[in-house]
Amino acid sequence: MAPVAMILHSLQLLQDQSFKDFGTLTVLFNPDEETGSSGSKKVIAELARQHDYVFSYEPPDKDAVTVATNGINGLLLDVKGKSSHAGSAPEAGRNAAIELAHQLLQLKDLGDPGKGTTVNWTLVKGGEKRNIIPSSASAEADMRYSDPSESDRVLADGQRIVKKTLVDGTEVTLRMEKGRPPLARNPGSEQLAKTAQTLYEKIGRSIEPIAMRFGTDAGYAYVPGSAKPAVLETMGVVGAGLHADDEYIELSSIAPRLYLTVALITRLSQDEAP
């Protein structure tokens, strides 16, 4: 709940200073973030497009602000074969597990290291009993990417590759479940990070702009090709061990990180003033 506390205390500090020059300041708390924000992603996107700046409060593991995050997709690979008795008539079957293994080898290089795209096959299922040739098999992959165009590229390449089968009579399909989009590197976020660095230096501290390899709700707020809103992620307190029993925050980071939110709102409001 540290992000919630950070936001509420930042608002209190602004109120204590009687600062109201920000135009419109909107706060959104969504309880479904851990499950993909399926119920709130539309609201996030709609509200973001009504504002000039968006701050998201994931916790950084060091004094940093994030200017880019990865997008997350899932790839679903399904093979349909034909079952048969493995002892008396194996030749009558069409082994979906063998075909799945063939496809996984073909698809192992779908990623693109040069673009930061990774595709890792992480779940495999096939067969029901040891004495039955499996009639179906499936696999799922985790895809991470920073270039928005990579979703279409990976799916197109994958669907082309799976047309080459090994086991005659099997059918193979590949589809994609789209998850969080990336917060791609963009001038607006980069400039916002520079402003954060300048403000942080005023209290004798330094802050680093970084790119994260995992996905966050900042991707829903980002509008590709548009200067606004400028989005900045990891505005929360510094900490680590997410979801673990030993998860923690650095208490010494609370005050400076509160300062950063308040100082950014104050500075950006002045910059936007007519």
Residue ranges and their predicted role:
Residues 1-5, 90-97, 248-255:
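Short, conserved micro-motifs enriched in small and acidic residues
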Residues 124, 205-272:
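Zn-dependent metallopeptidase/amidohydrolase metal-coordination segment
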Residues 17-21, 164-169, 202-203:
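Short helix-capping segments at alpha-helix termini
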Residues 98, 102-112, 120, 179-232:
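Active-site-adjacent substrate-binding region
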Residues 8-16, 102-108, 263-266:
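Short glycine/serine- and small hydrophobic-enriched flexible loop segments
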Residues 33-34, 41-187:
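Midchain, well-structured core segments that form catalytic/ion-binding scaffolds
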Residues 142, 155, 159-162, 197, ...:
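Generic hydrophobic alpha-helical scaffold/packing signal
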Residues 1-70, 269, 273-274:
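Acidic/histidine-rich catalytic neighborhood of metal-dependent amide-processing enzymes
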